[in-house]
Amino acid sequence: MATIYAAKSGKPPEPKQFYRDLATPGTLARKAFTLPYGLHAVSAMNNPAIRAQPIVSFGGIGSAAALGKFYSMLANGGEIDGRTFFSGKTIEWMTTTLTDGMDRVFQIPTAFSAGFMKDARNAKRRIFGTSPIAFGHPGAGGSHAFGDSENKIAFAYVMNQMEQSLLPNEKSLRIVDAIYDIL
């Protein structure tokens, strides 16, 4: 399958309350997304000098190939190339929804397993495909990666320039939809 998309792919609607909170000192969104570079933290991540810094929980930078390999290993029971990195029990915790409801930072319905995001029960738009056990995480700026052990799918999408976005961009979501449409 090959499709050429325009450079600007469009963005799904972003949660308006999140941006209001981001502009308000003292809110969870402001605390979570403005340290250490202020309100320009997302655009600052496009600077190679900033990207070289070890920023805990805000600097996960990798290639689509590396993310795809990671989620491929998870979607295949924690094993890759004959080596087991995670037990079946650990993978079960990754696929099991532990919390589901309104996210206090993003201000949208979210769900989480042990360490990963999942589609919320009442999500308006599924971002991890059709399987209820799929898990992963969108990246700040539009990136997106997940594993689906039910369908043996690993998906990773990154861009060479971050967008001002919290959620996967429309281009990546159309690719996810196309993958599941051919199953």
Provide a role label for each language-model segment.
Residues 1-129:
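Short, surface-exposed loop or secondary-structure junction motifs
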Residues 51-52, 136-139:
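Short, local alpha-helical segments
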Residues 132-134:
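A conserved acidic, glycine/proline-rich C-terminal tail/linker
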Residues 138-183:
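Structured C-terminal helix/loop/strand segments within mature extracytoplasmic catalytic/sensor domains
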